[in-house]
């Protein structure tokens, strides 16, 4: 629960400037992380020392539900001559380490990221006659922050977020988000590490799909060229009724050419998915991955879970060559989730050594597998095949209901434990499937109707007996079962 109020001390927008005129005890009274971010806000808005802000009534570190302590809201006059309209500028406080005393984030030093390493911003076009900023963007930012805190997945520029609902709960076509660097907020170095500022950009469904099929950065560049769709500063207009492709049909050609030339930069998604080892007898429940009702999958230990997460994170990192690194016990920063080139899955900023479970060291070769996806995840299979594997890359589906994962790899990917001789291989609940270019082309032909999901009914099954591979597209309820 949050409240709207003008910011006054000790909120993040009220302290005096640091320097000779600052009170001697100020540094000890005002949290240094807050002070550093406020300094950047004050640089940008020197005439708005006390902006309106949405404040968490019960702070997250006191058991409240909202991870962001504050969201400050500034009035930005834009630049009419540069096609930048007047707008509201929202800035979060809480994804980075504001306090440095481990109440929320573990302090890991001054050289790395502060907390999760970023704060969110959002630019909303100001409507004529609007005297105060709408507060719904603050709740949107809280929702994204909850996702980050709960999943430990971070965001990076070019990432996209599938929201499937108007951002302001209206009838708007703006129902999804891309993320980019804020055009005005500069990274700041705090006593607890570095903080960058990632701006939320509202987009239509068609624009989200293009970002998935190509890459987020490419679509962001197109949005910058269309003033009504964002312009140079990527300002969200919730009243925009047309996609950039309806405004300028030639932009679709640029996307198509980009996909053909570059492939897709989307290397993985969080998804409703599962897999079964069909070469094992059904009564062997120890390693079953079945999601059928009545089957209880084996629960992973905490160490197993962390090891798989780390391996997935490392496997999703973007390298100059497509590489899936071997399982390693060393934790380090990296990236995953519905994302972009440098995927976002920061699963820990500290370095610690974990015991590698025996099951994860041992690779199991499988003779026959059954892949299961919900409709939304299944619709991305052609993207995985055409935009990733045909370009010598890999693509991972990470289950949102557990630690299970499915990684498709091409023959050009190094470090994969699936090989042409044994194309289906598993480390615990992580399955890798190696597909040759010839088989990818065959699958694309057979899966053509996935690009028009409204034309088929669930459940839908595809099978390649000669390859001992089966793919099922299933209703969401199958994955939502508490027994899964």
Swiss-Prot record:
There is a cross-link at residue 321 (Glycyl lysine isopeptide (Lys-Gly) (interchain with G-Cter in SUMO2)). The modification N6-acetyllysine is found at residue 303. The keyword Ubl conjugation applies. Disruption phenotype: Complete embryonic lethality at about 10.5 dpc due to defects in neural tube closure, abnormal somites and abnormal heart looping. Heterozygous mice are born at the expected Mendelian rate and are fertile. After 1.5 years, they develop a skin phenotype characterized by ventral alopecia, increased pigmentation, with papules and nodules on paws and tail. SUPFAM superfamilies: Suppressor of Fused, N-terminal domain. Keywords: Acetylation, Cytoplasm, Developmental protein, Isopeptide bond, Nucleus, Phosphoprotein, Ubl conjugation. The modification Phosphoserine is found at residues 301, 342, 346, 352, 481. GO terms for biological process: aorta development; coronary vasculature development; determination of left/right symmetry; heart looping; negative regulation of smoothened signaling pathway; negative regulation of transcription by RNA polymerase II; negative regulation of ubiquitin-dependent protein catabolic process; neural tube closure. InterPro entries: SUFU-like_domain, SUFU_C, SUFU_C_sf, SUFU_N, Suppressor_of_fused, Suppressor_of_fused_euk. There is a cross-link at residue 257 (Glycyl lysine isopeptide (Lys-Gly) (interchain with G-Cter in ubiquitin)). Residues 336-347 have a biased composition (Basic and acidic residues). Polyubiquitinated at Lys-257 by the SCF(FBXL17) complex, leading to its subsequent degradation and allowing the release of GLI1 for proper hedgehog/smoothened signal transduction. Ubiquitination is impaired by phosphorylation at Ser-342, Ser-346, Ser-352 and Thr-353. Phosphorylation at Ser-342, Ser-346, Ser-352 and Thr-353 prevents ubiquitination by the SCF(FBXL17) complex. May form homodimers. Interacts with ULK3; inactivating the protein kinase activity of ULK3. Interacts with RAB23. Part of a DNA-bound corepressor complex containing SAP18, GLI1 and SIN3. Part of a complex containing CTNNB1. Binds BTRC, GLI2, GLI3, SAP18 and STK36. Binds both free and DNA-bound GLI1. Interacts with KIF7. Interacts with GLI3FL and this interaction regulates the formation of either repressor or activator forms of GLI3. Its association with GLI3FL is regulated by Hh signaling and dissociation of the SUFU-GLI3 interaction requires the presence of the ciliary motor KIF3A. This is Suppressor of fused homolog. It comes from Mus musculus.
